[in-house]
Amino acid sequence: MHEIRNELHLSGSQPNIEKLINSVVTPNYPMIDFARILPVPDELASLPAGMSRVKIDCYLTAVNPGTADHHLKKLPADEYDRLFRLVKEYYSNNDGFNHCITGSYPYPDVGYFADGKRMIDCLQKYGAPNWGDWCDQNWGQLTNSHIYEIEYNKWRFVTTANPSIKVIGKLAELNPAVRIYHRWASLGGRIVGSCLYENGQLIAEQECAPFSEDAISMEEALFPESRADYCEQQEP
């Protein structure tokens, strides 16, 4: 999984910046509390994150009008087809395991039917079937983020799945008096970009083409040690 370094530049009056910091940074520990900014929906938080694909496939098998009776009411064919396509597309886009969703699971476990249905409901409502996937999509990882470097009105922190674009966008919305510049890069320059927020609104964004000159330039700024290592390797 990619390590993505995120950097925030905060501009505004010192009282407004301190208010923002106090609202999201855990006292005595340099950690951004993402849950204070963009909390996990309660419906997702109450669902176990494990075995989502299996549970969903068991439920789809039970309600598939083309399978045997599993003591659960069958869905109309058009509704079943819609849900099946939704789930296949989700897993294809997110982890490439769309082939694991069959709608004809060999031995569907009745104990998974309820969770499978709830997970599909959450996928339709929130774009994710469980809290783990939701956190990856919205926070950039499963947990809060440690701030590994702090300068004057500048933070650097790491996420492990995606850049924390949505959570920082929400932070800007909650603190319109603070101008926020957010940039991020993965090592090697594959995932690189930036967003600028003023008055709580996104006013500029950039998504660099993977491995492009702009991407490598920003990657070197956020991973200065990688550039230093490269230069040392080139020395005679």
Region roles according to the model:
Residues M1-P236:
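Intrinsic low-complexity, intrinsically disordered or marginally ordered coil/linker segments
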